């Protein structure tokens, strides 16, 4: 499929700190891409670079084949960017903020009115459009920013935390809208809410320290972990001697001790019984076995160097 966005060796620095480290990848037209990762992984900076609101220190970003670094104004007409925090003009109403951006892009007044009505209705925002941005709730401000960035009908929508500051109902209506737009538009978003990511993605990028360390569909990413199980055994008294004995079992992977509980991974359930055999005679309080999930992909040790 045709790419909406292509990155070639994109780098971003802050003093001597690397924020983005030579990123190269493409994003297919009409796809919904989720970006996840720990704090300070570079997620928000990547969105700003993709939107053209920040220029990379090196490398190139192409929007529908246009080099953003050389023809920034041309390429930005294809994108809408919703940052995490509100950047609305506090002296204007929510509707005035939206209309102003529409006029900047040369959208006809009739189309602005039509789109405001459509998207504000979808987001249950109509009754709040007359309020000054300075007194709007953070959730309604976020909705207004989404409407504002859709007002010029961009082919690419980039959002930092789509449902930040929203209640459950508002979050649900926001995702309903975004899922309807998927396919028609390329949607790229950052979210710390893994349940949201699990419900809305064609592809997931996992970032760590400015790099993409995992990239694929959720099914493909989880396939790499499904051969593993995570085990927990809580003892009445897990001594260092006992922990070291259990950790020494050759089939145990990445054992950790938290209080009186040992956490470890293994490729097969048989590992569990090997550990229980080594712990024979010790008093136990609780046992658990589970498959790895998307949340485990965010564990820096697992994602960064695997379980082996």
Predicted regions and their residues:
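Conserved ABC transporter NBD signature motif
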Residues: 59-70, 74-75
């Amino acid at each position: 499929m045709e790419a909406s966005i292509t990155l070639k060796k994109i780098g971003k620095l802050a003093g001597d700190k690397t924020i983005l480290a030579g990123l190269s990848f493409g994003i297919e037209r009409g796809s919904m891409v989720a970006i996840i990762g720990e704090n300070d992984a570079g997620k928000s900076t990547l969105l700003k670079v993709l939107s053209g609101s920040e220029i990379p220190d090196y490398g190139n970003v192409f929007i529908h084949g246009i080099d953003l670094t050389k023809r920034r104004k041309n390429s930005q007409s294809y994108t809408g960017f919703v940052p995490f925090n509100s950047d609305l003009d506090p002296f204007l109403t929510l509707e005035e903020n939206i209309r102003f951006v529409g006029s900047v892009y040369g959208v006809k007044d009739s189309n602005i009115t039509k789109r405001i009505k459509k998207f504000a209705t979808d987001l249950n925002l109509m009754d709040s459009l007359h309020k000054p941005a300075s007194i709007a709730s953070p959730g309604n401000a976020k909705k207004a920013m989404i409407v504002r960035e859709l007002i010029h009908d961009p082919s690419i929508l980039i959002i930092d935390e789509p449902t930040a500051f929203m209640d459950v109902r508002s979050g649900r209506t926001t995702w309903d809208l975004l899922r309807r737009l998927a396919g028609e538009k390329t949607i790229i978003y950052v979210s710390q809410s893994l349940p949201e990511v699990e419900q809305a993605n064609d592809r997931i990028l996992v970032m760590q320290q400015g790099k993409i360390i995992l990239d694929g569909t959720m099914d493909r990413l989880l396939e790499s972990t499904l051969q593993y199980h995570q085990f927990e055994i809580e003892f009445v008294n897990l001594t260092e001697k006992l922990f070291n004995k259990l950790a020494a079992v050759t089939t145990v992977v990445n054992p950790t001790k938290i209080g009186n509980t040992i956490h470890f991974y293994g490729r097969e359930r048989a590992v569990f019984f090997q550990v229980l055999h080594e712990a024979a005679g010790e008093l136990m309080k609780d046992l658990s076995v589970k498959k790895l999930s998307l949340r485990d992909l965010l564990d820096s040790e697992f994602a960064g160097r695997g379980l082996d």
